[in-house]
From Swiss-Prot:
SUPFAM superfamilies: P-loop containing nucleoside triphosphate hydrolases. The keyword Kinase applies. The gene is adk. This is Adenylate kinase. The keyword Hydrolase does not apply. Its main location: cytoplasm. It comes from Helicobacter pylori (strain J99 / ATCC 700824) (Campylobacter pylori J99). ATP binds at residues 12-17, 131, 173.
Length: 191
């Protein structure tokens, strides 16, 4: 059975970098996916699902939830790795509930933990505005992204805490310290 770890955190928390480094350090056993990459890859395949994804994204619309969850589960199941890290998901209560429903309806993938990389809003802001990835990384957009992250956060935290799946990792430290702690935690499930 595949072991799934969801990695969540504010914009600038380092969740993607952390997940990428852990997958790279453990390339035999761990795969890392981001939801956006999965949707783009599926779209590029021109499958029935891919064409549907393209129809929405080309119009600048959100891809329907069921399609996103199907795409995620399909990628997990087809991966040759036993441990899967997905960063930036869930971003909403609806995404959380949809994934939970799908995971409960099958027996190939088990959610082992939701790891939250926790940083202060000031740290997140410094990191995002300091790295200037593009025009969207300005202050107004940062605050909007932060709001989108924070609005459902307590409900998401409480849902996974009730299932004893929520783990907080202090993201205010060096990348090495964060990656080491997260990697040790993830690998503790493999034994």
């Amino acid at each position: 059975m595949k072991q799934l770890f969801l990695i969540i955190g504010a914009p600038g928390s380092g969740k993607t970098t952390d997940a990428e480094l852990i997958a790279k350090n453990n390339s035999e056993t761990i795969a890392h996916f981001s939801t956006g990459d999965l949707l783009r890859a599926e779209s590029a395949k021109k499958t029935e699902r891919g064409l549907l994804i393209e129809k929405f994204t080309s119009q600048g619309e959100l891809v329907p939830l069921e399609i996103v969850v199907e795409t995620i589960l399909s990628a997990i199941k087809s991966s040759s790795k036993g441990i899967i890290l997905i960063d930036g998901y869930p971003r909403s209560v609806e995404q959380m509930q949809a994934l939970d429903k799908e995971l409960n309806a099958q027996n190939e993938v088990i959610l082992k933990s939701v790891i939250e990389v926790e940083v202060s809003e000031n740290t997140a802001k410094e990191r995002v505005l300091g790295r200037s990835r593009g025009a969207d990384d300005n202050e107004r957009v940062f605050h909007n992204r932060m709001r989108v992250f924070l609005d459902p956060l307590v409900e998401i935290q409480n849902f996974y805490k009730a299932k004893h799946l929520h783990k907080i990792i202090n993201g205010e430290r060096s990348i090495e310290e964060i990656v080491n702690e997260m990697q040790k935690y993830i690998l503790s499930f493999a034994n």
